[in-house]
DNA sequence: GTGCAGACTTGGAAAAATGTTC
DNA sequence: GAACATTTTTCCAAGTCTGCAC
């Protein structure tokens, strides 16, 4: 079902993609064209190459509170008998216990990894006893956490207020830093608490123990002359360094994948805002190059070199289908997912004819986060022929583009345009699509609600292009039904109001006095109001249905140049709060400061 | 080229906050 | 003002891409 829906929406998208593109109007960061008001905060500050700051001062990260042992009444059972666990073993048991209702705990890999790591935390005697997860009973632990969550929900107003104030205090104390003389918000000032690793899809490491991070694991980054953050009492930092070519404040190595995690600034900070702005400027710059790049890769489909042909076909997919680059992954370390360059023969099927089109390529693979990408696309004949060639005498597990890597692809792109990489195409195509869609869908005479539907639809076209999917919300059916009930009720009200208006009209005709006239006017206004409400409700229903399995957030936050949306709001008199929430407006402060209603991507 | 570490962006799910209805 | 629905924010996993060593 989902696949069919996406396919249909994609077909519509392809059609709209045929609309001729308007010539680029190029704006340079800081140029008059793109700016309105001073935007001074967003003038690029002159740091030499690679330097991110002159001054960085902060309080260090906030650590998860120490483990609180379970109360005596909450027991763990093994083979039906209560077993008292050591604190270390109990803590890890609670990580599993609190997840009992979750699907993860039904997965064999998760269970196996958890049990394996749990046993490492046990004392020798515990290990002697606890030998099989199937004989473990965590239900009391689970219930304890469920009750605890429920108790939090029913706290009194005062108690809730107190908790809120405590959180705010924490935010004030650890949530900000000073960067080059300005106070900036930190994105994630809390060190990740210990728990069980929740890898997505068929992740081979799911269920493994994510160790508790101690100050001794943490590297602090701050300026030499600043007040060095105090480690928690009785502890010390792994290292304190002063590296102003990076933006992170603190870092540690996570125990499951052995990768580095960072404390970084919030997206509303100047530093993050500037990089986002730069990213969109690079994508805008691509507008001026894209025609030539397209003609070049088309020419390269006929190259004598296999490597060049593969690169040209891959680039075509990246451009046309907004596929990700697809870096190589170590097998066994993560779920088996692919992007463009790592596609295997088994991920594509060639159809000489399908859906009434010639040369159809069927893609079916798991992309980032194990989200399935399924698409059937008619391609140009040389692409089709090349794919046949690339697949010749290969097994299903072989790489489709065996002569291509993301590094070589990006090296090539860099030669075509300064700063160009595979991902820029995603940004470029997402933003240009939003702009085109808004132009095609918005009508100036529409109501605000209808304009917002148009905006969401434009946003949705982009999300579908980028394959941003979500699980259907669990409450979807029910809430849809509620909405339908509401619509039905409103329809009845409208019918009733219409009848009343008819009666009032007759009454006025008969009486012809001022009183009946004012009644008539009142009835007319009522009908209008109800009709408007009905229209709004049905718009809501349409939007909801179309959005069932599409996630709009990622494209909105990462791929769509906010200046396009802001300009649209200004042009069509839609309050920007209808499009961006408070945090989103803070994140896009740079764009709000500079985009006028005539901004063009 | 290839492998790896590091730094940063992008991603959906889950939790929390807020709004609506009875 | 409780119960439920919806929206917003937080969380942290999973990508991209660069630079360096060999």
From Swiss-Prot:
Residues 268-601 form the Topo IB-type catalytic domain. Residues 1-50 form a transit peptide. It comes from the Eukaryota. Signal peptide: none annotated. GO terms for molecular function: DNA binding; DNA topoisomerase type I (single strand cut, ATP-independent) activity. InterPro entries: DNA_brk_join_enz (IPR011010), DNA_topo_DNA_db_N_dom1 (IPR013034), DNA_topo_DNA_db_N_dom2 (IPR013030), TopoI (IPR001631), TopoI_C_dom (IPR025834), TopoI_cat_a-hlx-sub_euk (IPR014711), TopoI_cat_a/b-sub_euk (IPR014727), TopoI_cat_euk (IPR013500). GO terms for cellular component: chromosome; mitochondrial nucleoid; nucleus. It is found in: Mitochondrion. This is DNA topoisomerase I, mitochondrial. Residues 261-262, 324-329, 421-423 are annotated as: Interaction with DNA. The keyword Cytoplasm does not apply. Divalent metal ions (calcium or magnesium). Residues 22-48 are annotated as: Disordered. One of its GO terms (biological process) is DNA topological change. It catalyses: ATP-independent breakage of single-stranded DNA, followed by passage and rejoining. SUPFAM superfamilies: DNA breaking-rejoining enzymes (SSF56349), Eukaryotic DNA topoisomerase I, dispensable insert domain (SSF46596), Eukaryotic DNA topoisomerase I, N-terminal DNA-binding fragment (SSF56741). Its cofactor is Ca(2+); Mg(2+). The keyword DNA-binding applies. It comes from Pan troglodytes. Gene3D superfamilies: 1.10.132.10, DNA Topoisomerase I, domain 2, Topoisomerase I, Chain A, domain 3, Yeast DNA topoisomerase - domain 1.
């Amino acid at each position: 079902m989902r696949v069919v829906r996406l396919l249909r929406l994609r077909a519509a998208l392809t059609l709209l993609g045929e609309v001729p593109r308007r010539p680029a109007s190029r704006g340079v960061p800081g140029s008059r064209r793109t700016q309105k008001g001073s935007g001074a905060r967003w003038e690029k500050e002159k740091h030499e190459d690679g330097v991110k700051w002159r001054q960085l001062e902060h309080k260090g990260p906030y650590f998860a509170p120490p483990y609180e042992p379970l109360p005596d009444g909450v027991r763990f059972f093994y083979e039906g008998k209560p077993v008292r666990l050591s604190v270390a073993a109990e803590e890890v048991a609670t990580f599993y216990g609190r997840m009992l209702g979750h699907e993860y705990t039904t997965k064999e890999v998760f269970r196996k990894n958890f049990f394996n790591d749990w046993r490492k935390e046990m004392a020798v005697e515990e290990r002697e006893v606890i030998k099989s997860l199937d004989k473990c009973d965590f239900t009391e632990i689970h219930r304890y956490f469920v009750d605890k969550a429920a108790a939090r929900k029913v706290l009194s107003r005062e108690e809730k207020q107190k908790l809120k104030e405590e959180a705010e205090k924490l935010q004030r104390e650890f949530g900000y830093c000073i960067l080059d003389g300005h106070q900036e918000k930190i994105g994630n000032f809390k060190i990740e608490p210990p728990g069980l690793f929740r890898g997505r899809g068929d992740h081979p490491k799911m269920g493994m123990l994510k160790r508790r991070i101690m100050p001794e694991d943490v590297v602090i980054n701050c300026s030499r002359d600043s007040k060095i953050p105090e480690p928690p009492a009785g502890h010390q930092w792994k290292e304190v360094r002063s590296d102003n070519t990076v933006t992170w404040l603190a870092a540690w190595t996570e125990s499951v994948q052995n990768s580095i995690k960072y404390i970084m600034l919030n997206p509303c900070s100047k530093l993050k805002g500037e990089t986002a702005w730069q990213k969109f400027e690079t994508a805008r710059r691509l507008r001026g190059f894209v025609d030539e790049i397209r003609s070049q890769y088309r020419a390269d489909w006929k190259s004598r070199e296999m490597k060049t042909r593969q690169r040209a076909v891959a680039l075509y997919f990246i451009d046309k289908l907004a596929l990700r680059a697809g870096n190589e992954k170590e097998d066994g370390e993560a779920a088996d997912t692919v992007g463009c360059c790592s596609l295997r023969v088994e991920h594509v099927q060639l159809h000489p004819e399908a859906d009434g089109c010639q040369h159809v390529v069927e893609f079916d693979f798991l992309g980032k986060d194990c989200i399935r990408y399924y698409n059937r696309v008619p391609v140009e004949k040389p692409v089709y022929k090349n794919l046949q060639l690339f697949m010749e005498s290969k097994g299903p597990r072989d790489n489709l583009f065996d002569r291509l890597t993301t590094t070589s692809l990006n090296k090539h792109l860099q030669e075509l345009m300064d700063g160009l990489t595979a991902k820029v195409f995603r940004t470029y195509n997402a933003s240009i699509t939003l702009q085109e869609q808004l132009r095609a869908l918005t009508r100036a005479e529409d109501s605000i609600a209808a304009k917002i539907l148009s905006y969401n639809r434009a946003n949705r076209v982009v999300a579908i292009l980028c394959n941003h999917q979500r699980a259907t919300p669990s409450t979807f059916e029910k809430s849809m039904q509620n909405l339908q009930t509401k619509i039905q009720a409103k329809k009845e009200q409208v019918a009733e109001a219409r009848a009343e208006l008819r009666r009032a009209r007759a009454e006025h005709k008969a009486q012809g006095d001022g009183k009946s006239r004012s009644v008539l006017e009142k009835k007319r206004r009522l009908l209008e109001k109800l009709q408007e409400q009905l229209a709004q409700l049905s718009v809501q229903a349409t939007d909801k249905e179309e959005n069932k399995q599409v996630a709009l957030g990622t494209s909105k936050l990462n791929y769509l140049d906010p200046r396009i949306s802001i300009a649209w709001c200004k042009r069509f008199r839609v309050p920007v709060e209808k499009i961006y929430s408070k945090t989103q407006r803070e994140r896009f402060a740079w764009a709000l400061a500079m985009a006028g209603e005539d901004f063009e991507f």
